[in-house]
């Protein structure tokens, strides 16, 4: 099944929502290890309370989950062999980019080369899939 540009854009948005929120979630959840309770059940409840009471965590979490919802909805009409590579590969790229913007050490030239190669591979994958839909009649 070939993909439309709309489906591809939805998958790229999923990757941005997943990958772009990871550094924010990591930063907002720092200090969680300081929560200490006697039982695992109370520990879990206190950790949930600490996370969901923190808007710096809650906003990226909700954006991340909206990416999951969009992914689920997009999978109904998109080939899985296209959706998985786009979302998972580009999510890593978005994580690195947002991490760099936030001042994290993402690695050196090797990380940049990896991002370029990933984007190149995904571009080939997308172009191949979308070009199959060009000129084909719609079967609606």
Swiss-Prot record:
Presence of keyword Transmembrane helix: yes
Pfam families in the record: TMEM234 (PF10639)
Transmembrane regions: 1-21, 82-102, 111-131
Major localisation: membrane
Membrane among keywords: yes
GO cellular component entries: membrane
Domain of life: Eukaryota
Coiled coil: none
Membrane topology reported for the UniProt record: Multi-pass membrane protein
Compartments in which it is found: Membrane
Swiss-Prot/TrEMBL keywords: Membrane, Transmembrane, Transmembrane helix
PANTHER family: TRANSMEMBRANE PROTEIN 234
Family: Belongs to the TMEM234 family.
Protein name as it appears in the record: Transmembrane protein 234
Organism: Mus musculus (Mouse)
Name of the encoding gene: Tmem234
